[in-house]
């Protein structure tokens, strides 16, 4: 009988402890599919399971429940993962919670509903956000002017804007592309939409859309914009009630002395900018640094700021990466003149040599906005008509990771910021 008890004791304590969590590491050494890792995190949230985002732990790793379904899905998508025991999980969480560590575990509660503001037809340029959402297998809904004016933004938690022009100047493409079929088509469609919506000018339509987006953010929504959507949005708000469009855009001259009538109090991020008056110049204002940059491609990088994960979890979430040095990339709006960024706005990524802000974040009312300069993080100088980037060649792109940080940010359990 004594031998039987000994045998039972050995069997009982030799059974392996069942794992309770799956760790998706996000450091440079362990993960080969950083972008798809965001997709599996979103997919887990869709299953109504909670996830912990381990800020500053191994590149901003994710802690998921241990289920066979999640492990199988990780294998299908080629995502590296580690199965953790209860004791190992507790050890990691204790490390993260230590006051001596600049780390934090943030709970992600639900999959955010994502809207992408984009014309329904194809455009002669790519959209970095729709490409990375598709690659990461994160679902989104395309909406445009008609849906925004019908208050359908209220159905979504997160709104993306990319290569857009909210000023009614058709992207300032007049000089180079006014005879191009796509330009003529886009102009006619915009004019028809303006009339259908009850406006006599496209600039009036775009202002109405901008005001709806502003109200969406003020009411608690999250807006993420890239490239020309960033500065043209603020310009449209600042120029409310002022005609800044020349005759080739709206069939009448611009308003005399319009620069003096610009109201910087209306903007989200920018101040004291000077508008580009010439319709022949591919530029909206002095906000953008594209033509003023003095740096060559080979050394064009920007640096992510470092924040206290425990005291400032929001910007910490938005800068999670496996490197703090990000390759620069250009766009119609590449970066922002630091002196024209409002003091209330956080500069999360900067190119110090040129005095450029590349990646900025702010609060508006109950909501948040992030502006990210440049067009495509893996195409240094994307031009009209260029082939789209194949993200299969860049599965761990640090520049694209910043976009996906913003996608998951609305999923975080809201906790009052301490600073």
Regions found by a protein language model. Name each.
Residues 1-4:
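Positively charged n-region of N-terminal signal peptides that target proteins for export
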Residues 14-16:
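N-terminal signal peptide c-region/cleavage motif recognized by signal peptidases
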Residues 19-127, 136, 374, 416:
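Hydrophobic targeting/anchoring helices
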Residues 20-26, 32-63, 243, 341-419:
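Extracellular ligand-binding/catalytic regions of CAZymes and related secreted enzymes
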Residues 22-32, 62-72, 122-230, 234-239:
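Helical hinge/lid and interdomain linker segments adjacent to catalytic or ligand-binding clefts
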Residues 107-110, 151-154, 216, 363-365:
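Extracellular/periplasmic catalytic domains that process cell-envelope and extracellular macromolecules
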Residues 127, 134, 231, 250, ...:
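Catalytic beta-strand/loop cores that center a nucleophilic Ser/Cys/Thr
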Residues 183-184, 198-199, 206, 218, ...:
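Catalytic cores of eukaryotic secretory-pathway lumenal/extracellular enzymes that build
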